[in-house]
Swiss-Prot record:
Gene Ontology MF term list: glycosyltransferase activity
One protein family per Pfam: Glycos_transf_2
Family that this chain belongs to: Belongs to the glycosyltransferase 2 family.
Name this polypeptide is given: Uncharacterized glycosyltransferase MT0564
Keyword Glycosyltransferase: yes
Keywords, in A-Z order: Glycosyltransferase, Transferase
Length: 218
């Protein structure tokens, strides 16, 4: 699939430090779309300076930012990755290629690099939620879709309504209900390259995310 058919949506809240390297790693021909979700730093300025399209989404929440980015995209394929540098955008082409093989949604399973400190709350939450997705929804996944690609129109038609941390989990649940073919591939996962995690960076953030997840999955 041609690169110009893909928009990479990057939801951002205060990611000025990590954005330059993240944007530089996006595959040639892919379009970068940064959604500034109430940043108090120079996220929007840095993104524009490095060639990304910038969309401002004032409604707080990860799901709000992702949805705004998908709406603003004009390509047939959309990809979503975190903007903190923890994942390698170079993994995206292999995910996109699975769409041509019949997949409806392709997600990344994080494989930590050697020596990475992955907070135990985040690890346990991921294990529990992915187990629930496998046993209750028959999805062949071991992670909660931190990196993902899908066809834009089909994604919008799926009607995901969560605008907080539960967005990716609801996406998977709705994909299962719709009979989508979901494929999960390994992707590299390293330390964030700047800033502070909005989820695992604090106990409060982790607990809020887990509650959002459980609300979707229960």
């Amino acid at each position: 699939m041609a690169g110009d058919a893909v928009t990479v949506v990057l939801p951002c809240l205060n990611e000025e430090e990590s954005l330059p390297a993240v944007l530089a790693a996006i595959p040639a021909g892919y379009r970068a779309l940064v959604v500034d979700n109430n940043s108090t730093d120079d996220t929007a300025t840095v993104a524009a300076r490095h060639g990304a399209q910038v969309v401002v989404e004032p409604r707080p929440g990860y799901g709000s930012a992702v949805h705004a980015g998908v709406l603003a995209a004009t390509t047939p394929i959309v990809a979503v990755i975190d903007a903190d540098g923890s994942m390698d955008a170079g993994d995206l082409p292999k995910l996109v290629a699975e769409l041509d093989k019949g997949a409806d949604l392709v997600t990344g399973r994080r494989r930590p690099v050697a020596g990475l400190h992955w907070p135990w709350v985040a690890r346990v939450g991921t294990v529990v939620m992915s187990w629930r997705l496998r046993t209750r929804h028959r999805l062949p996944v071991h992670d909660i879709a931190p990196m993902r690609v899908a066809r834009r129109e089909a994604l919008l038609d799926l009607g995901v309504v969560d605008r907080r941390s539960g967005y990716p989990l609801e996406l998977l649940v709705r994909a299962a209900a719709a009979g989508w073919r979901v494929v999960e591939l390994d992707v590299s996962y390293g330390p964030r390259t700047g800033g502070k995690s909005k989820v695992s960076g604090s106990l409060r953030g982790s607990i809020i995310a887990i509650l959002d997840f459980w609300k979707v999955i229960s």
